[in-house]
């Protein structure tokens, strides 16, 4: 669903870099937990790797310009542009090591960045503001939004069986349709919380009690 763990790649080849890393990666907002990418789209599969302290995230390149999260706190990050050679083999086209000093350690969980996109004028943001008006604590606000989501969005099993692996939720469309999968629930919840300045992380992975790949939230 847009980000993958290292184990999904059979071979990752570090070879000669071809693209100029300074042109690929926009570092103007790294202290806000955001790295911009600027990549001409090609026919072959392309991914961005973001790595820190042994933990790695991979993102499919969907558009020529995008914003990706630096969500592992302050420190040294390795950023790399990967291009598919064949099958599950990827070569490093360009890479750059950067020092990130976040303005706030949770700041990336307030941003509109993949896979949680939102705007102040969006339905999700307006609804979050309406639901939490006159509430005096973040806990009350988080609970109010949670209750709304679980009572107004129905789990869509049909969608799950027909979903592409590069799917990214449109939170306003999910709210309007009243249907979604776990990824949708988590994206809507994170977007609504972020819009009212509550840091929220969207987590993806496996749980012991759930067979399929799953999504959930961490709220700070």
Task: Identify the function of each model-found stretch.
Residues 58, 135, 163, 182-183, ...:
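Residues in flexible loops and secondary-structure boundaries
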Residues 32, 168, 212-213:
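Short, solvent-exposed coil/turn segments
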Residues 152-155, 179-182, 207-210:
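Solvent-exposed loop/turn segments at secondary-structure junctions
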Residues 110-177, 188-190:
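Secondary-structure boundary elements
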Residues 43-46, 165-168, 180-186, 194:
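Generic detector of short, locally flexible boundary/turn motifs and exposed helical patches
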Residues 20-22, 50-53, 172-173, 187-192:
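N-terminal start-of-chain detector that recognizes signal peptides
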Residues 184-220:
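Hydrophobic/aromatic-rich core segments of domains that either
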Residues 2-139:
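N-terminal accessory/pre-domain segments preceding catalytic cores
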């Amino acid at each position: 669903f847009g980000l993958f763990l290292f184990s999904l790649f059979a071979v990752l080849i570090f070879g000669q870099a071809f693209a100029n890393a300074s042109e690929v990666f926009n570092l103007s907002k790294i202290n806000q937990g955001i790295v911009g990418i600027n990549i001409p789209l090609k026919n072959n599969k392309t991914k961005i790797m973001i790595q820190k302290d042994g933990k790695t995230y991979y993102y499919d390149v969907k558009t020529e310009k995008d914003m990706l999260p630096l969500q592992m706190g302050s420190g040294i990050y390795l950023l790399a542009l990967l291009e598919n050679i064949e099958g599950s083999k990827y070569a490093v086209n360009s890479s750059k090591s950067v020092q990130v000093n976040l303005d706030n350690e949770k700041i990336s969980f307030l941003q509109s960045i993949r896979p949680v996109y939102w705007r102040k004028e969006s339905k999700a943001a307006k609804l979050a503001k309406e639901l939490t008006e006159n509430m005096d604590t973040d806990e009350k606000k988080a609970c109010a939004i949670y209750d709304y989501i679980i009572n107004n969005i129905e789990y869509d099993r049909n969608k799950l069986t027909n979903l592409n692996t590069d799917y990214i939720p449109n939170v306003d469309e999910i709210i309007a349709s009243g249907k979604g999968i776990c990824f949708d629930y988590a994206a809507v919840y994170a977007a609504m919380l972020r819009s009212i300045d509550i840091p929220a992380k969207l987590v993806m992975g496996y749980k012991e009690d759930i067979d399929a790949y799953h999504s959930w939230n961490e709220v700070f």
